[in-house]
Curated annotation (Swiss-Prot):
Reaction equation(s) it catalyzes: a ribonucleotidyl-ribonucleotide-RNA + H2O = a 3'-end 3'-phospho-ribonucleotide-RNA + a 5'-end dephospho-ribonucleoside-RNA + H(+)
GO cellular component entries: cytosol; extracellular region; fungal-type vacuole; vacuolar lumen; vacuole
Active site residues according to the UniProt entry: 87, 156, 160
Designated name of the protein: Ribonuclease T2-like
Organism of derivation: Saccharomyces cerevisiae (strain ATCC 204508 / S288c) (Baker's yeast)
Ranges that cross the membrane: none
Pfam families attached to this UniProt entry: Ribonuclease_T2, RNaseT2L_C
Main localisation: other
Length: 434
């Protein structure tokens, strides 16, 4: 049997939660779609907020770690040759942006042993899939770009899964589950992510429309978007390309009705402002292909420079820069900052005082003092060819402060996630490469 056909032949089932005893959410049947309610919903275990927009994101990783891998090695590293792989399931906020790493007490450092726990592998008929079987499917379909696949699973749950309000541990208790702790939420996050991924079979959809991996052929943006939209209830789907203008990612946007455990996802149009794919000449390279005209992707990019405040209050004649603790000064010398590409997207921000993060308990203040990278936040950064660019957080590029730091004073700054930006001083953060 050719491994490239493994995905097609298995026709793996979708594992619903419908028969799971004791955790069926006791929610009103007329609950509105996420992001569409006109009044407050009292029970946050039945209605997802603020992250009411769910993105099911998929990779097409074709670059192998080295040349001349055989089919077995390619599948192990990149997944089935006739399937996209899972990136994650992300709860974006209704008004834009997203939360991340929401509850450090719920974070995990292991998936393998958790899914081997006897509570998920005791022949309990209330579970539609055992933890061990689910782990097999994750290992086949959820691939990282660095070979450590479990580290991607851990990252995705810690960054996004901990922000899903309807699978908090207290929700399981409310629904009458027996002896359920936070492990059940981890199991459900991975199970539901896998289920939605299987429903959204990107490879088969493209193949049905004569868009198949090829070294020679190319496709238009309109062709690819139209094919995916047709199978997604006519809604627009986001596609992303790498620097070779080759298709490498697809995002499906959904609203949710009720709890995540209901799995009632409703397709919606992509909210992404733009794609990095060109209008024409998009490649869809087969897995294992290495373009000879380009170097391999730079997965460990670093940029060193300073951070200056840009366009303060829409052009007022004020100035400023960041010092090593993340505060704003208007006079003196700016600190050296380093932007470090994280393994799975976004960037770490660091000074010689430590890694930076946004502290939600302090009104989203920027603080740079953390010695352990596990405590570091992940920032948005889109460098230009020169290496300069704007810094954001959780999809938001608005920053603000309450006090202008005159002379040698310093002021804290804050990530502001509302369009109005209620801070007295409003600005962007521009990274300028040394």
């Amino acid at each position: 049997m050719l491994l490239k056909n493994l995905h097609s032949l298995l026709q793996l089932p979708i594992f619903s939660n419908g028969a799971d005893k004791g955790i069926e959410p006791n929610c009103p049947i007329n609950i509105p779609l996420s992001c569409s309610n006109k009044t407050d919903i009292d029970n946050s275990c039945c209605f997802e907020y603020p992250g009411g927009i769910f993105l099911q994101t998929q990779f097409w990783n074709y670059f192998p770690s080295k040349n001349d891998l055989n089919e077995t090695e390619l599948v192990k590293e990149l997944g089935p040759l006739d399937s996209f792989t899972i990136h994650g399931l992300w709860p974006d906020n209704c008004h834009g942006g997203y939360q991340q790493f929401c509850n450090r007490s719920l974070q995990i450092d292991d998936v393998y042993y958790l899914l081997h726990d006897k509570k998920f592998n005791n022949n309990d008929t209330s579970l539609q899939i055992s933890g061990e079987k689910l782990l097999e499917y994750l290992d086949l379909y959820w691939k990282s770009n660095n070979g450590n696949h479990e580290s991607l699973w851990i990252h995705e749950f810690n960054k996004h899964g901990t922000c899903i309000s309807t699978i908090r541990p207290e929700c399981y208790t409310e629904w009458g589950a027996n002896s359920v702790d936070r492990k059940r939420a981890v199991y459900d996050y991975f199970r539901i992510t896998y289920n939605l991924f299987k429903k959204l079979d990107t490879f088969s959809t493209l193949e049905k429309n004569n868009i198949v991996p090829s070294v020679d052929n190319s496709y238009s943006l309109e062709q690819i978007e139209a094919a995916l939209s047709k199978e997604f209830e006519g809604k627009k789907v986001f596609i992303g390309c790498d620097r070779h203008n080759s298709l490498n990612e697809v995002w499906y946007y959904n609203h949710l009705k009720g709890s995540l455990l209901s799995e009632m996802f409703v397709p919606m149009d992509s909210l992404a402002i733009r794609t990095n794919c060109k209008k024409d000449g998009i490649k869809f390279f087969p897995k294992g292909y290495v373009p000879t005209f380009r170097r391999r992707p730079n997965k460990g990019a670093r940029y060193r420079g300073v951070v200056r405040l840009s366009n303060i209050n829409n052009g007022d004649q004020m100035q400023g820069f960041l010092i090593k603790n993340g505060h704003w000064m208007s006079q003196g010398t700016p600190a050296n900052y380093e932007l470090i590409k994280s393994p799975y997207g976004n960037y770490y921000l660091r000074t010689n005082q430590g890694f930076c993060d946004i502290i939600s308990s302090s009104s989203n203040e920027l603080v740079c003092k953390f010695r352990n990278i596990k405590d570091a936040g992940q920032f948005d950064f889109d460098p230009t060819k020169g290496g300069d660019g704007y810094i954001g957080y959780s999809g938001n590029y608005n920053w603000g402060g309450d006090t202008y730091p005159r002379r040698r004073n310093q002021s804290p700054i804050f990530s502001v996630d509302d369009e109005q930006n209620s801070k007295k001083y409003k600005f962007k953060l521009k990274f300028i490469k040394n």
